[in-house]
Amino acid sequence: MSEEVTYATLTFQDSAGARNNRDGNNLRKRGHPAPSPIWRHAALGLVTLCLMLLIGLVTLGMMFLQISNDINSDSEKLSQLQKTIQQQQDNLSQQLGNSNNLSMEEEFLKSQISSVLKRQEQMAIKLCQELIIHTSDHRCNPCPKMWQWYQNSCYYFTTNEEKTWANSRKDCIDKNSTLVKIDSLEEKDFLMSQPLLMFSFFWLGLSWDSSGRSWFWEDGSVPSPSLFSTKELDQINGSKGCAYFQKGNIYISRCSAEIFWICEKTAAPVKTEDLD
């Protein structure tokens, strides 16, 4: 009888323990439910996103580092290029400075040579004038025979016949010259000093141009008022015709009048070899 009770008790206890275990498991299951599949996917996506962001940041960092290195390299190249350009500019400036110095030296030498040649020409002219005055044994003849030499011009005073202004002009052209033109007071004084002009009338290359309503020299230039006295200006402004020289003054007459005339042409240069 006691064995049966014991068996029953053990059986009861085992059954109660198993039940207690099952109840404990059920309680644990109810207290800590299993994770939901949706949250698991969300967590996985978040981790993946973090990894992608991390990879992106690393990639951007590497790109930034590479770009920084490239910029630094380009900056060094640019700095070197600027130094090279500056050096070339300095060299060019120095060369230009040397060229300017050479140009200044060249101009100085040219001016010196020009000055020497001018003095030599003046001395040759003076010597030639002395030879013409004092001797006939020379080859210095800047003007043809019967022509008078003054400064850079030769003058021919016609006294063997009288002609109108137009015919006198033609005769000068035939002599490869023109009717005289007064360019300066010195030239006017030279003409006034000629004895022939004290007693005779001589045509000048000054005439009234009716088409232009003005006075012109043979070369087309307008006479300068500073070359004429007040009396002469009154003559010129109050008359129309052709100008002539007489007794050191300029007068106006009919161009058809027949008087003497003066031709003028450029003198030949004086050659030093003709002074021997």
UniProtKB/Swiss-Prot annotation:
GO process annotations (BP): melanocyte proliferation; natural killer cell inhibitory signaling pathway; negative regulation of natural killer cell mediated cytotoxicity; negative regulation of receptor signaling pathway via STAT; negative regulation of signaling receptor activity
GO CC annotation, single: protein-containing complex
Annotated TM spans: 44-64
Entry comment describing in which tissues the protein is expressed: Detected in colon, heart, kidney, liver, lung, mammary gland, ovary, spleen and testis. Expressed in melanocytes (at protein level).
Glycosylation sites: 91, 176, 237
Induction notes from the record: Up-regulated upon differentiation of monocytes to macrophages.
Posttranslational modification: N-glycosylated.
Keywords attached to this entry: Cell membrane, Disulfide bond, Glycoprotein, Lectin, Membrane, Phosphoprotein, Receptor, Signal-anchor, Transmembrane, Transmembrane helix
Membrane topology, as annotated: Single-pass type II membrane protein
Pfam families in the record: Lectin_C, Ly49
Principal localisation: membrane
Segments on the Extracellular face: 65-276
InterPro entries named in the record: C-type_lectin-like (IPR001304), C-type_lectin-like/link_sf (IPR016186), CLEC12A/B (IPR042916), CTDL_fold (IPR016187), Ly49_N (IPR013600), NKR-like_CTLD (IPR033992)
Claim: Cell division is one of the keywords in the record: no
Residues recorded as bearing Phosphotyrosine in the entry: 7
Residue spans, topological domain Cytoplasmic: 1-43
PROSITE patterns: C_TYPE_LECTIN_2
Residue numbers covered by motif ITIM motif: 5-10
GO molecular function: carbohydrate binding; protein phosphatase binding; signaling receptor inhibitor activity
Purpose: Inhibitory receptor postulated to negatively regulate immune and non-immune functions. Upon phosphorylation, recruits SH2 domain-containing PTPN6 and PTPN11 phosphatases to its ITIM motif and antagonizes activation signals. Although it inhibits KLRK1/NKG2D-mediated signaling, it does not bind known ligands of KLRK1/NKG2D and therefore is not its inhibitory counterpart. May limit activation of myeloid cell subsets in response to infection or tissue inflammation. May protect target cells against natural killer cell-mediated lysis.
Quaternary assembly: Homodimer. Interacts (via ITIM motif) with PTPN6. Interacts (via ITIM motif) with PTPN11; this interaction triggers dephosphorylation and activation of PTPN11.
Name this protein carries in UniProt: C-type lectin domain family 12 member B
Biological source species: Homo sapiens (Human)
Organism classification: Eukaryota, Metazoa, Chordata, Craniata, Vertebrata
